[in-house]
């Protein structure tokens, strides 16, 4: 028994066994570089033509949506999802409430963002996309990058969403889930405004 008690402190002071050879730790910055490569890979695969195939739309329309999203600082994936839900990619779409075009802009909202948005410009695909995505970008900034709240405000109006939030109510009406679908986790807690 005395021998065991005396030997215990010596065992506790022994250094840990060396790592097995052949198991090298990743060099510093490895994971950051891997993430950057994965992002680049996703961007290469997310070109307008891949969206055209996925949504079965013309290459011209896919390029217009992709370019307008990039110009206005919106994640192209979110932009395509928004246009699909709003107009099903129909540039002449009109809602019963009076919303128009690919991004279903209300005339007053469109004019508040760009005063030239009147008449035929509301359904001009490039102008409608540009102003619709700028509006979404403004909402993303207003809601500190919260995509769910920005989409709800896009659908219901900023004043309604703000009022619900002030009153402690959840402004959810199902719209954000409809746009985000299975990709909702991708946007949770992360702003999509690209720099």
What are these regions (language model features)?
Residues 1-7:
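Bacterial N-terminal signal peptides
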Residues 13-14:
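Boundary of Sec targeting at the N-terminus
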Residues 25-195:
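Catalytic glycan-binding domains that act on GlcNAc-containing polysaccharides
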């Amino acid at each position: 028994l005395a021998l065991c008690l005396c030997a215990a402190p010596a065992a506790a002071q022994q250094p840990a066994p060396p790592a097995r050879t052949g198991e090298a730790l990743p060099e510093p910055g490895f994971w950051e570089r891997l993430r950057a490569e994965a992002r680049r890979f996703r961007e290469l695969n997310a070109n307008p033509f891949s969206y055209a195939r996925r949504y079965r739309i013309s290459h011209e329309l896919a390029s217009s949506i992709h370019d307008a999203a990039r110009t206005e600082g919106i994640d192209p994936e979110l932009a395509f999802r928004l246009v699909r839900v709003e107009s099903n990619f129909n540039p002449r779409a009109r809602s019963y409430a009076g919303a128009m075009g690919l991004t279903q802009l209300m005339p007053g909202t469109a004019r508040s963002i760009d005063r030239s948005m009147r008449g035929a410009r509301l359904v001009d695909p490039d102008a409608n996309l540009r102003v619709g995505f700028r509006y979404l970008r403004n909402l993303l900034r207003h809601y500190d990058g919260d995509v769910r709240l920005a989409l709800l405000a896009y659908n219901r109006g900023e004043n309604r969403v703000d009022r619900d939030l002030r009153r402690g109510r959840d402004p959810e009406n199902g719209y954000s889930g409809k746009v985000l679908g299975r990709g909702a986790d991708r946007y949770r807690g992360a702003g999509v405004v690209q720099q």
